[in-house]
UniProtKB/Swiss-Prot annotation:
Binding, Zn(2+): 335, 417, 421, 426
Gene Ontology biological process terms from the UniProt entry: regulation of DNA-templated transcription
GO molecular function: RNA binding; zinc ion binding
Annotated Pfam families: Herpes_UL69
Residues in CHC2-type zinc fingers: 335-426
Post-translational modification (record): Phosphorylated in vitro by SRPK1.
Region (Disordered), start-end ranges: 42-164
Cellular compartments annotated: Host cytoplasm; Host nucleus
GO cellular component, one term: host cell cytoplasm
Coiled coil: none
Basic and acidic residues composition-biased segments: 98-107, 154-164
Protein name: mRNA export factor ICP27 homolog
Family: Belongs to the HHV-1 ICP27 protein family.
């Protein structure tokens, strides 16, 4: 390999890509000296990768740094993260006219840079490495790193000193100026609210608490007397929730329960309040049974061609039931929606409940949430009836639903998902614990085709 020489012709121009990420304030002499050093070391011909390009003669002008456009890495704590890019670099030498040098061709030379060193068969260029080392030391001296953490006493002193109070007053003045400029009202507690909060609880006595308990007890006793009477079914007592009721039995006696809700308006309001109280504290198993109770009730009324009133205790508490199911099955449904194959469907539980599309139904879990969300939305809007078309797209309302499938189907989905997923959140969040102090008020029947 022949040694490269540097011509002194001032017309020679050079465009050089940044090999060593030099600082922008470097003098032109250092830049030209470094390129000259590369030529003298005869390392321009080292090839990157499997390239076999040989070395060429390099021409450098003293003013070549005018075309020098370096690319720098980001600074962190006064030091550079990566001073050199770990990839091959190219030195491009361009002549405005080849006749200035006797028709000689000047071609591109290559150099390989690895971790700040120029690899070649003969030598290394250590000049840039020394510069990087010296600059790093000077940066450490000029730009100290993060100051040491303050002790509790120092932090308290800084909080209570005069400079801190001065900064706080300036910030408060700036906020006040902005508020006046844009006419922003001041957010403050009203005098009436201050008076109410300060005197809260002053009138509570033992007698007033006892009177409240007696009033609630009278309402519960009145409701329990009606629930245990013969008015629930024609010719006998309604089976209740202690034993399972078959679908034919519910079709036989269900209209009597419907008539009871229509006859006792006051007791229906009590039933709604007690049922909502029970539903909000139900466990997962009990919440799934309540979901089956709601959907079975809707299916029975549609089969008998009866109007579905929203003031019915079973229908009126659908919003509380939906909130409890979201709380119990939220992590499981979130993982289920993210991993399903349908890319066009809803990907989150809030999106599923907001859109309430029949096309989002892919399993019994999504079916339960979409149906109950549709019913709850109608109740919240204040409608008097639930239209059949709002809850079913078939001629026979809820034809695809089997009584008891919410409990059996969701438990089956949980078991299958636990085997496939294995996430701890999906398993522990659906732990079916029972509340020992939950009373069965507001629960009217249990109808399930499955033995579970």
């Amino acid at each position: 390999m022949a040694s490269a020489s540097i011509p002194t012709d001032p017309d020679v121009s050079t465009i050089c890509e940044d090999f060593m990420n030099l600082l922008p304030d470097e003098p032109s002499d250092d830049f030209a000296l470094e390129v000259t050093d590369w030529a003298n070391d005869e390392a321009i011909g080292s090839t990157p990768g499997e390239d076999s390009t040989t070395s060429r003669t390099v021409y450098v002008e003293r003013t070549a740094d005018t075309a020098y456009n370096p690319r720098y890495s980001k600074r962190r704590h006064g030091r550079r993260e990566s001073y050199h890019h770990n990839r091959p670099k190219t030195l491009v030498v361009v002549l405005p006219d080849s006749n200035h040098h006797g028709g000689r061709d000047v071609e591109t030379g290559y150099a390989r840079i690895e971790r700040g060193h120029r690899r070649s068969s003969r030598s290394y260029n250590t000049q840039s490495s020394r510069k990087h080392r010296d600059r790093s030391l000077s940066n450490r001296r000029r730009r100290p790193t993060t100051p040491p953490a303050m002790t509790t006493g120092e932090r308290n002193d800084q909080t209570h000193d005069e400079s801190y109070r001065l900064r706080f007053s300036k910030r408060d003045a700036r906020r006040e100026r902005i508020r006046k400029e844009y006419d922003i009202p001041v957010d403050r507690i009203t005098g009436r609210a201050i008076e109410v909060v300060s005197t809260a609880g002053a009138s509570v006595t033992i007698d007033s608490v006892r009177h409240l308990d007696e009033t609630i007890e009278k309402l519960v006793v009145r409701y329990a007397t009606i629930q245990e009477g013969d008015s629930w079914a024609s010719g006998g007592c309604f089976p209740g929730i202690k034993q399972n009721t078959s679908w034919p039995e519910l079709m036989l006696y269900g209209h009597e329960l419907y008539r009871t809700f229509e006859s006792y308006k006051m007791d229906s309001r009590i039933a709604r309040a007690l049922r909502e109280r029970v539903i909000r504290g139900e466990s997962l198993i009990e919440a799934l049974e309540s979901a089956d109770e709601l959907l079975t009730w809707i299916k029975m009324l549609a089969a008998k061609n009866l109007p579905i009133y929203t003031n019915n205790p079973i229908v009126a508490t659908s919003k509380s039931l939906l909130e409890n199911l979201k709380l119990k099955l939220g992590p499981f449904v979130r993982c289920l929606l993210l991993n399903r194959d349908n890319d066009l469907g809803s990907r989150t539980l809030p999106e599923l409940l907001r859109q309430q599309r029949f096309s989002d139904i892919t399993c019994i879990t999504t079916y339960m949430f979409v149906m109950i969300a549709r019913i709850a939305n109608i109740v919240v809007r204040g409608s008097k009836f639930v239209e059949y078309d709002d809850i079913s797209c078939n001629v026979q309302v809820l034809q695809e639903y089997t009584p008891g499938s919410c409990l059996a189907g969701v438990l089956e989905a949980l078991i299958t998902h636990q085997r496939e997923c294995g996430r701890v959140e999906c398993t522990l969040s659906t732990w079916a614990g029972h509340l020992s102090d939950a009373r069965p008020y507001g629960k009217y029947f249990k109808c399930s085709t499955f033995n579970c």
